[in-house]
Amino acid sequence: MSVNINYLLLIPEILVLSLGILLFVLALITPRNLQKGIGYLTTIGLLGIFLYMPIAWKHTGMAIEGMYQVDKVAIFFKALSLLAGVFVTAIAPRYMEKIGYYSEFFVFAVFAVLGMMILVSATDFLTLYLGLELMTITFIILAAYRRDSAIGAEAGIKYLILAGVSSAILLYGLSLFYGLTRTLNIVDIAAIVTNNGISPAFVLAMVFVLAGFAFKISAVPFHMWAPDVYQGAPTPVTAFLATGSKAASFAIFFRFFYLAFPGIREHWVGLLATLAALTMVVGNLVAIPQTNLKRMLAYSSIAQAGYILVGFLATDFTGFKAIMFYLSVYLIATIGAFTVVTVYENVTGKEEIRDFAGLSQRSPIMAAVLVVSLLSMAGIPPLAGFAGKFYLFYPIIKNWGWLALLALIMSMVSVYYYLRVVLVVYRDEPEDQTPITLPNSIYFTLLITMAVTIVLGVYPTPLAKIAQQAAMIFMK
């Protein structure tokens, strides 16, 4: 049986795969003392592919018949994955030089991006699982990248075991769906459900799949891996997990549930509301006593997943628009915060909140970016996070008023632990007065993330229009 393949629609994936193979070959043949350029080549390569995405936006359709859909939602999330890859590889070189094993990091980072891109276009169980496992396996390797560190090894082992368990749960759910429907295509499931209804076994399969996806987005109660892995992994990897991986996982989450189960929304929407409420509450409350900044940001990331889940409860395309907009501004703010943590940890070897005392005196730009990023995550106007939360919470007020109120309260709670960091950075005196010098790649990353966070807060319309255009296509 022949399969129709539209290679024009696969150009971004082909380019990323080619870049990964090129880097792999260069890592093998280039002497260690000459491998510094591999990091910069990775950033430039991913940036070039990202700049191609406006062209890709104009070309949509089924790339691989019945298995791989390239629509505007997929292109949007591929652009986010590439953007996360650009920023992470831009901030990683000096950090990886200090760890050692320099070039391998960039090879795995590129293949992680490829896994994300495959995942967000999947409309078939096989492509879904292929993309998910490519992304997961590369992140397992990256999480354990500090092989000489006990906490790094612990992070890798925990992620390996728990990711394996979650993948097994997801695969079992998918196998149940196949046994019940005799199809691997996500869209075909919707037609079968409409004609035949659902059975207890179907509900069980849905729960297994939901649990598997909930692990990937670190939703409560499947979040326990996140704090330990975020703290133990190299900081650029933590940034990548918190942004690119989370965005891609949310993309396939809502693609799966809204394509496969649109006619039985009432059976799963209440479960998602409960999941969102638990995730917001646990993430924010447990973040309060944290003393390690990376660990605090891990719980903050869990809470952010709860806010994003709220967008699933909207009854029209505004929920999709809100999810895409918020994931974009969350990605930018999170990259900004983790860039500061990466540089500071690389200079001082410290990542406790108290260790950032007086950062404003040592590096005003780092302090400003950290504060702007944290306040944006808290939803403080006029920053981008405020606009994002407005888009998320407003559509659900009518039908889910209690959840919108809870989300608002939890956002106010988050201000407390974010402001703790702000006070340490600006109020306390530093132990070391030595100014922190920044390489150009770091400096530009800091400036870009801060500028975009401020501009999108004041003028969110351009990004909101792009998200709305993609969301309306998806609803069709």
Swiss-Prot record:
Coiled coil, from the record: none
Domain of life: Bacteria
Catalytic activity: a quinone + NADH + 5 H(+)(in) = a quinol + NAD(+) + 4 H(+)(out)
UniProt keyword Chaperone present: no
Gene Ontology cellular-component terms listed: plasma membrane
Residue ranges of the TM segments: 9-29, 37-57, 73-93, 105-125, 126-146, 160-180, 202-222, 244-264, 268-288, 297-317, 323-343, 365-385, 402-424, 444-464
GO annotation terms (biological process): ATP synthesis coupled electron transport
Cellular localization per UniProt: Cell membrane
UniProt EC number: 7.1.1.-
Topology term for the membrane: Multi-pass membrane protein
Alphabetical UniProt keywords: Cell membrane, Membrane, NAD, Quinone, Translocase, Transmembrane, Transmembrane helix, Transport
Keyword Translocase: yes
Subunit structure: NDH-1 is composed of 14 different subunits. Subunits NuoA, H, J, K, L, M, N constitute the membrane sector of the complex.
PANTHER family: NADH DEHYDROGENASE
Entries under HAMAP family matching the protein: NDH1_NuoN_1
Family statement: Belongs to the complex I subunit 2 family.
Task of the protein: NDH-1 shuttles electrons from NADH, via FMN and iron-sulfur (Fe-S) centers, to quinones in the respiratory chain. The immediate electron acceptor for the enzyme in this species is believed to be a menaquinone. Couples the redox reaction to proton translocation (for every two electrons transferred, four hydrogen ions are translocated across the cytoplasmic membrane), and thus conserves the redox energy in a proton gradient.
This protein's name: NADH-quinone oxidoreductase subunit N
Gene name tied to this protein: nuoN
